[in-house]
Amino acid sequence: MQDLFGSVRRSLVFRSTTDDENQENHPPPFPSLLADKITSCIRKSMVFAKSQSPPNNSTVQIKPPIRWRKGQLIGRGAFGTVYMGMNLDSGELLAVKQVLITSNCASKEKTQAHIQELEEEVKLLKNLSHPNIVRYLGTVREDETLNILLEFVPGGSISSLLEKFGAFPESVVRTYTNQLLLGLEYLHNHAIMHRDIKGANILVDNQGCIKLADFGASKQVAELATISGAKSMKGTPYWMAPEVILQTGHSFSADIWSVGCTVIEMVTGKAPWSQQYKEIAAIFHIGTTKSHPPIPDNISSDANDFLLKCLQQEPNLRPTASELLKHPFVTGKQKESASKDLTSFMDNSCSPLPSELTNITSYQTSTSDDVGDICNLGSLTCTLAFPEKSIQNNSLCLKSNNGYDDDDDNDMCLIDDENFLTYNGETGPSLDNNTDAKKSCDTMSEISDILKCKFDENSGNGETETKVSMEVDHPSYSEDENELTESKIKAFLDDKAAELKKLQTPLYEEFYNGMITCSPICMESNINNNKREEAPRGFLKLPPKSRSPSQGHIGRSPSRATDAACCSKSPESGNSSGAPKNSNASAGAEQESNSQSVALSEIERKWKEELDQELERKRREITRQAGMGSSPRDRSLSRHREKSRFASPGK
């Protein structure tokens, strides 16, 4: 045994080249052959193979499939149904899209091929991560369905929000479009084309963040569902580009066309082309004419330019998603530039501005319900009444012939381009008068949402000069003008309040019309009295509409009472007409107020009598229908209760 190990040691360490040459000419002895075999075995063993890298078991190991449980139905599409699911391992909520797998033997091979392609593509999509795209979590294959596990977005799609809330304002459209382009830019940078951008495939979470869904693998899903006998993509032709319909080959520019159609959908609340053509007619029209959908008229110039660039007929002329992210409609830079221009104009004016008001965004808006906050621009006086606007919307928007027109905000100062004012020898746009702004206000709600602009010129030495100053925390430039403006506004509000009060009940309207037709003096005294007593007592308390009698019964008593009031007042007014004004003014006012109070008390008494008669008539009808009578005692008690109930009609 020792000789054996000794020979092995000598063969490993002490062998020389001469021994090898001798072995070539002479056959080796038996111990030497055994030593060579042992040496080769040792060299092939793991002791001498440490330098070789072991196989990576982590890449070879396949993760177990996600265990999930199906929940309620979320939606149903052309290529399958979407359910809510739960990951049984982590508890995460999922959106599971189920695609049917055909059992036909003829198309089984094609089905398996598409399933493998879809699974491979989902594996690639799992590596994508962006806040504006839906994450792919994996696939689970079952006997008759293929389940695609997606990120669950709780808010719903844009199309569902349009059905609930109607068309979006332009500010919301701008926010959603910006996020849509960010997600689309990420997909295009990873060489992924969406192919089916529309409101139904754009999801919104609770924070207003949108996420693109059904991208990348949509082509494989469509082919797989077509083999299974699913219907065509319903509604999608409205968003298709002409090159997609003609099947002449399309690229990322087809997604840009769909972005423009989606913006039209958000602005109008309806799918593009849906008002003019049905689906088949829309396909024929788009494919033959290559025209873009009609652009709405109620959008700004920036939004119009954005849509025209997205809906170019030639695909090569359409901008990319990265270029559209720099458009003024998405960034809103034109609005900021208009604010900077206004700030520079105020800095160069003759009246110095406070240091804290050099930035246009620092203008203060009123958070109270009154209309008392007035900021004076010298002779340009703007009354701000924004009780419901947040601080984020405190920038002043000016509308000119080339300015930014923001349709979603009503708090803007309208500028008339046709009229001009002179400023240091130069001409510029002038502002509308306050009376014109008042004419556009028809309701009380519009008073708190519009910016009233008052313009007057201060003439001196034969030259017209416009002084601009901003004094928010200081007294106004002219207290008399402020008082006059406030009095006009209060008078306007009083008139509107009186008109609204008239519409509350037909009784007051008929009484008011009778007073007007009978005597103008009564009408004037009534209006003056109402204005004097409006704060402590308000308007006349009238019975509710539901308990008021018919118009035929009420129409007689006010007219008779009015005639009586006018007849009783006419001698007194005739006697006082010939007297001097300085001695009989107070007596005439007292007589008018007394006659009016008598007329009102007479009308109230007539109303109460007619109400009692009407209630008694209804009570008899109810008793007759029930077939049972009531005793005189019960009738008197009930009548007493009804009288006490209607003693105060306003309660």
Curated annotation (Swiss-Prot):
Region Disordered, residue ranges: 460-483, 537-601, 618-651
Gene Ontology MF terms: ATP binding; MAP kinase kinase kinase activity; protein serine kinase activity
Biased composition range(s): Basic and acidic residues: 464-477
Catalysis: reaction(s): L-seryl-[protein] + ATP = O-phospho-L-seryl-[protein] + ADP + H(+); L-threonyl-[protein] + ATP = O-phospho-L-threonyl-[protein] + ADP + H(+)
Disulfide bonding pattern of the chain: none
UniProt-listed InterPro entries: Kinase-like_dom_sf, MAP_kinase_kinase_kinase, Prot_kinase_dom, Protein_kinase_ATP_BS, Ser/Thr_kinase_AS
Subcellular location, record wording: Cytoplasm, Cytoskeleton
Binding site for ATP: 74-82, 97
Any one GO biological process: cortical microtubule organization
Main localization, broad class: cytoplasm
Pfam families named in the record: Pkinase
Polar residues bias locations: 570-599
Domain of life of the organism encoding this protein: Eukaryota
EC assignment: 2.7.11.25
Keyword Kinase annotated: yes
Keyword Transferase set for record: yes
UniProt keywords, alphabetically: ATP-binding, Coiled coil, Cytoplasm, Cytoskeleton, Isopeptide bond, Kinase, Microtubule, Nucleotide-binding, Serine/threonine-protein kinase, Transferase, Ubl conjugation
Cross-link (Glycyl lysine isopeptide (Lys-Gly) (interchain with G-Cter in ubiquitin)): 108, 110
Protein kinase domain mapped to chain residues: 68-330
Tissue specificity comment: Expressed in roots and flowers.
Residues annotated as the enzyme's active site: 196 (proton acceptor)
Matches recorded under Gene3D superfamilies: Transferase(Phosphotransferase) domain 1 (1.10.510.10)
Cited function: Involved in cortical microtubules organization and stabilization by regulating the phosphorylation state of microtubule-associated proteins such as MAP65-1.
Family classification: Belongs to the protein kinase superfamily. STE Ser/Thr protein kinase family. MAP kinase kinase kinase subfamily.
Protein name stated in the entry: Mitogen-activated protein kinase kinase kinase 2
Lineage, broadest ranks: Eukaryota, Viridiplantae, Streptophyta, Embryophyta, Tracheophyta
Gene that specifies this protein: ANP2
